[in-house]
């Protein structure tokens, strides 16, 4: 079984990941042959984006199973899952994917074809992600008017998923439907996913895109230059509170103040029904060097103290709607999320 998209390639024996740290200047793949190499790729942001992380971890689980040599298989796979789980604490898709793989593993523990069954499940997950993103795109495109200028933050495109994207999937689907769309991509400090990745993706697709600094958004909204904000999500609480790349909350506040619709585009798997509100979402703190350095060059004084939370939480009152593959969820969010989840 094989899979090949922009973000990842499953060769049948290894997982090749597009090294997103080097984009847009170098297109280079990193080959992972063990679950620990996959964990390293997730932790070091060779691959990033909640849906992509989830599927990557699923293939890491497959590789972990193949590494088993002797002893208690269940205990070995528990350790494999733990190694992969420790990589990124905020993205719920990671845990969703690993729990799904573990369930299949335990249900087929005595099956002699267990390795093939696990590989099939990871492949199924990858294909589902592509189909899900296209459904999100179709549902979201209906909210985009012809001639709109859309502001997006970070990168929630094909690079953040198996293919097509969530927030950028909405934009792609609108363009495919014949609508004229212009995009403003926040540079998204400190990792510059907007400037490096979103701009790269949209330019390859021939979609008009402007890179703006993170602190321009409010002024552009005030001048009436932005018609909607569309972002992705790393975890959504049961009440609709949404964790996404740091800076998302600021955009939501600005959008509310300037009467600009603020949309979150994410698969149902990003909703965490075990978390009642955003107050319970763990926020990853990353290395100081990501803030003090840019492009390998120091840009801040030696020894300066740094805060580097990778995500923030936008409360549901600032969100116009959540776009999913099962439809568009509008307020009251908790009631409507429960309906769509069937809980």
Swiss-Prot record:
Reactions the enzyme catalyzes: 5-(methylsulfanyl)-alpha-D-ribose 1-phosphate = 5-(methylsulfanyl)-D-ribulose 1-phosphate
Entry annotated with the keyword Isomerase: yes
Biological processes annotated in GO: L-methionine salvage from methylthioadenosine
Annotated binding of substrate, by residue: 48-50, 88, 193, 244-245
Pathway where this protein functions: Amino-acid biosynthesis; L-methionine biosynthesis via salvage pathway; L-methionine from S-methyl-5-thio-alpha-D-ribose 1-phosphate: step 1/6
A Pfam family hit: IF-2B
InterPro entries per record: IF-2B-related (IPR000649), IF-M1Pi (IPR005251), IF_2B-like_C (IPR042529), Initiation_fac_2B_a/b/d (IPR011559), M1Pi_N (IPR027363), NagB/RpiA_transferase-like (IPR037171)
Molecular functions per Gene Ontology: S-methyl-5-thioribose-1-phosphate isomerase activity
Site (Transition state stabilizer): 154
Keywords of this entry: Amino-acid biosynthesis, Isomerase, Methionine biosynthesis
Key word Nucleotide-binding present: no
Residue numbers annotated as active site: 234 (proton donor)
EC category: isomerase
Domain of life (superkingdom): Bacteria
EC number: 5.3.1.23
Stated role: Catalyzes the interconversion of methylthioribose-1-phosphate (MTR-1-P) into methylthioribulose-1-phosphate (MTRu-1-P).
Family: Belongs to the eIF-2B alpha/beta/delta subunits family. MtnA subfamily.
Protein name: Methylthioribose-1-phosphate isomerase
Gene: mtnA
